[in-house]
């Protein structure tokens, strides 16, 4: 599994990579996942929908990530809105 961060103008940046079935890798992936959420990022897992259509599922906890997921993409929340 790869944890990637979308960065404007630079594309995806690899934050962490590992096998979640390996306890050491899983711990590192969970730590980075939590760190990104603490920084205010959102997390999405790309999935292939019906008829090969691209979709993504938002996740808030590492345990919500499907076992077969190859990557999780972090991106900043939209700026603006009500104050």
What is the role of each PLM region?
Residues 26-29, 46-49, 56:
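Short secondary-structure boundary micro-motifs
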Residues 36-53:
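Short, basic/aromatic beta-hairpin or loop at an interaction surface
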Residues 1-40:
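Extended boundary segments
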Residues 32-33, 42, 73-78:
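Hydrophobic alpha-helical segments that drive targeting, anchoring, or assembly
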Residues 51-83:
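Short, compact, well-ordered microdomains
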């Amino acid at each position: 599994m790869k944890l990637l961060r979308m960065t404007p103008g630079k594309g995806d940046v690899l934050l962490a990579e590992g096998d979640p079935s390996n306890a050491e890798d899983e711990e590192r992936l969970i730590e980075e996942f939590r760190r990104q959420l603490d920084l205010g990022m959102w997390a999405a897992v790309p999935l292939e929908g019906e008829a090969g259509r691209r979709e993504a599922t938002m996740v808030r906890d590492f345990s919500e990530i499907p076992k077969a997921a190859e990557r999780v993409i972090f991106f900043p929340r939209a700026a603006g809105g009500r104050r």
